């Protein structure tokens, strides 16, 4: 199957003011400009000093003028056009500075040519054609290299888009196979995927079994065994067997497209630090122009040498690099959000990366976050002579049969495993923070937790409850006619990575807090095993939100980790909301960060990525600002008295290097 680049996702973010110039344009312009520049360099003296390889003959100055004019308008076009764009948006920056520099050099050289050839003056006026040629060449080469570096720092989205194949094998009538374009695939179509091929769309396996490599899509390092009715993600690699997949999502609704959309949006949103760097970069233009003009005036007063003074002005204009400052944060952001996406960490809100450095407490739901959420039934019992234990289990399963809560799934699966049939329930309603109610076989039933029994003054066996709860069971009761008629106790397994995650949080001076609707005994048992000392149990959904508010009222920064749907109010209330175990449903509204997998270690991965991201941002900001603070005065000739003078060509090299260093530094960002 062919692969394509999904062009609509390629230009996912704007890195500075020349994002509309492809690096290929700079490459071709550089080599064509080199053809015009070489004769200028050979025929024209540098700063009036003739170099050993240079020659001149009658009419050579006219050749230099013609070639320099072509070079100025052809090789200089990206900078002149860029300056026009910047000025039209009232945001003059690097392109305007470069355009000013080459324009001053070219216009003054025209004046020098006139003075030397038509004025009749006996004194020779030095031109800047040599400097103009080398300046344009270096700037084109620098931008070509820079665009490659910038592209490498932020092109992970393009790589994600390329994971999707261009075509797929679709099953049509009588099991005939037809290769069609991805755009011709629709929901409920059946596609066949052979070993080693990319899964073309999100879907469900309807035939066959295989192992799937999701590492490039969700960051899952191990191959995942998939069989009938299992979900597969478009872009993942089919490992060992041929499978037939029923399409469940196409185009923009697919997992990869949603991820790319979210990452694209996050990269284009500006954080506070980026807004500050943009503002400073904007001021830098006026700073450079001011220093350039001041240096020109000062050197004219000191030496009365227009050539030297003009060289200072041009060097200042080309050496100043607001671009390095402007790219300092966007490049790191592009790299960071892309790394996150490849590892199943979808960063929706850019500011969460900055806030993560100041988190004091991480509050977590127990079920599904710290524990597997796969509940096994350890005990069930009838409390009425009218129904035996199996009939009580059947009623539990009936009422829970339409729910996707982990407790409900555990009961239904257990009943199926024991071949116990159950009826279809009627009028089922959730009771928030309690359980649910409904009608089964004309019986009005409720499944509730122990908090409900206590608050409603129901009579129940408290000793039995305590014994089961201390074994780590979540306990539910069945009520009919205000009588407790049955009990079911379910055990959950703590995730292997939970204990390490809690240990890592404590080592970072972040306090883990458990918030759960489960009973206190179970919560305490899990908390003690994990080393969590701060536990809040038997909570209603609104209780979690109010607890977060209480902690925040003391000035603490809170990150909440929980279910993107059930814990939505808490995720929104927290300083950072992290929705865990979203799977392919990454379009969850609540949550600044979305964890595709239900792996607690991804919480630490996010904190590590955030820390490394901020470190790179600070490094780039210091470099971008520090470079300009040092380079601009040097270009102005502040150390000329000790012989340290920078030519425009050297200034251009330094300016290009400054941006390349920022891009390379961003590219070295790692998850851990």
UniProtKB/Swiss-Prot annotation:
One GO cellular component term: plasma membrane
GO biological process, one term: copper ion homeostasis
Keywords: ATP-binding, Cell membrane, Copper, Copper transport, Ion transport, Magnesium, Membrane, Metal-binding, Nucleotide-binding, Phosphoprotein, Translocase, Transmembrane, Transmembrane helix, Transport
Coiled coil: none
Matching InterPro entries: ATPase_P-typ_cyto_dom_N, ATPase_P-typ_P_site, ATPase_P-typ_TM_dom_sf, ATPase_P-typ_transduc_dom_A_sf, HAD-like_sf, HAD_sf, P-typ_ATPase_IB, P_typ_ATPase
UniProt feature, compositional bias: Basic and acidic residues: 1-17
UniProt binding sites for Mg(2+): 563, 567
Chain spans, region Disordered: 1-22
Top enzyme class: translocase
A family per Pfam: E1-E2_ATPase
One Gene Ontology MF term: ATP hydrolysis activity
Record carries keyword NAD: no
Active-site positions on this chain: 365 (4-aspartylphosphate intermediate)
Main location: membrane
Disulfide bonds: none
Topology class, membrane: Multi-pass membrane protein
Swiss-Prot/TrEMBL catalytic activity: Cu(+)(in) + ATP + H2O = Cu(+)(out) + ADP + phosphate + H(+)
Compartments, record wording: Cell membrane
E.C. designation(s): 7.2.2.8
Gene3D superfamilies: Calcium-transporting ATPase, cytoplasmic domain N, Calcium-transporting ATPase, cytoplasmic transduction domain A, HAD superfamily/HAD-like
Transmembrane spans: 30-50, 55-75, 93-113, 125-145, 282-302, 313-333, 621-643, 647-669
Family: Belongs to the cation transport ATPase (P-type) (TC 3.A.3) family. Type IB subfamily.
Summary of the function given for this chain in its UniProt record: Involved in copper transport.
Protein name per UniProt: Probable copper-transporting P-type ATPase B
Species per Swiss-Prot/TrEMBL record: Staphylococcus aureus
Gene name per UniProt: copB
